[in-house]
From Swiss-Prot:
GO-annotated molecular function: RNA polymerase II-specific DNA-binding transcription factor binding; transcription corepressor activity
Residue positions where Phosphothreonine is found in the record: 445
Biased composition (Basic and acidic residues): 1-11, 26-48, 258-267
Major localisation: nucleus
Entry's Gene Ontology cellular component terms: cytoplasm; cytosol; NuA4 histone acetyltransferase complex; nucleoplasm; nucleosome; nucleus; replication fork; Swr1 complex
All residue ranges annotated as the SANT domain in the record: 149-199
Name recorded for this polypeptide: DNA methyltransferase 1-associated protein 1
One of the GO biological process terms: regulation of cell cycle
Region (Disordered) location: 1-48, 258-305, 404-467
Job description of the protein: Involved in transcription repression and activation. Its interaction with HDAC2 may provide a mechanism for histone deacetylation in heterochromatin following replication of DNA at late firing origins. Can also repress transcription independently of histone deacetylase activity. May specifically potentiate DAXX-mediated repression of glucocorticoid receptor-dependent transcription. Component of the NuA4 histone acetyltransferase (HAT) complex which is involved in transcriptional activation of select genes principally by acetylation of nucleosomal histones H4 and H2A.
InterPro entries named in the record: DAMP1_SANT-like, DMAP1, Swc4/Dmap1
UniProt subcellular location: Nucleus; Cytoplasm
Organism: Homo sapiens
Record keywords: Activator, Chromatin regulator, Coiled coil, Cytoplasm, Growth regulation, Isopeptide bond, Nucleus, Phosphoprotein, Repressor, Transcription, Transcription regulation, Ubl conjugation
Amino acid sequence: MATGADVRDILELGGPEGDAASGTISKKDIINPDKKKSKKSSETLTFKRPEGMHREVYALLYSDKKDAPPLLPSDTGQGYRTVKAKLGSKKVRPWKWMPFTNPARKDGAMFFHWRRAAEEGKDYPFARFNKTVQVPVYSEQEYQLYLHDDAWTKAETDHLFDLSRRFDLRFVVIHDRYDHQQFKKRSVEDLKERYYHICAKLANVRAVPGTDLKIPVFDAGHERRRKEQLERLYNRTPEQVAEEEYLLQELRKIEARKKEREKRSQDLQKLITAADTTAEQRRTERKAPKKKLPQKKEAEKPAVPETAGIKFPDFKSAGVTLRSQRMKLPSSVGQKKIKALEQMLLELGVELSPTPTEELVHMFNELRSDLVLLYELKQACANCEYELQMLRHRHEALARAGVLGGPATPASGPGPASAEPAVTEPGLGPDPKDTIIDVVGAPLTPNSRKRRESASSSSSVKKAKKP
């Protein structure tokens, strides 16, 4: 049974005071008009949602609770008032117009700039970027013992090293400032070769035994060849550029044909291997003694064995299926092969949809697989014969033109024009584009042969139209 304290807790009344201390509840405790007034006074002022406005939109505009923090940092404390600059309470650091000297200059020039007063007397901050190249210095004795060269005098070598220190080994500038009137005219490669040769000699002479040497090496011959090749590349004529682009295109075509031919040969090898494997398996199956198995175990064997030509679907775990579905050709067999397969079955007098018994399904699938394999082998054989014939004609044409290194032989075809040897006028040799030998071969399709014949006929018509 509920006590007075439970009732007070449910009604949210105060603690045990007056009558409540004795455990009894009075009418005043239940009504409690003072508490209701305090609740009303404590309620905050709310705004009513306007009519026609959705609750979600109104919740975005107004909320009884505090607004959510913004996604981007912002300063909304000032409202629409002009925001004043928040300056620090510290004093401004004084600046001073003071002189300075640049350590990179040797003439002692004086400059002025603004700088903080606390930094007076410090070094110029950009002096640390004054990096110079360490050019070796040699003595008269070292030059006579190790650095003497008949092609270079001592004065010319000193002049080279002086310019190297002044211009930080910028050899193009050194070559421009070189005194060609007093000394022999030198190229940039000659100056580099002499400088690095002396550096390597001094490094070997001054090296401490047992230390790893970092000897600078400069190949002047390689540099000269590189510049010569770049100059030739730059001085190419538009005809040479076009011929080079044509040769690159022909090279890409030859490489593509080579890859296609290799792929075809691999496919052909797979077909031959598959045919041999299938024939060997069937010989083994015929020699093996057949044992009669119970009906249950016979149903457990795979419905269709894996064949070389066509891989039929396996319905081992597909539930209840019709046996005729096992004879359905997979989608991987193209329409062209399907039509050829049907034509071969009609020529053999075999029904296209025989009665789907267990033995007939197995044998019918094997027959169609062998027929597809035979069809692919015939196609590969025809392609090889076409390629062989095309290469034979090309070899004969090149032999008649004398491209293969031997004398030009007259054509063996009928007609008066074919009996005469090929005569070429001086200066009008065969087009280099027409004499390119494709050692790989063209694509093995009759369409490519038709395209080549049409292209050759059009080129001959163009030559005939020229005056």
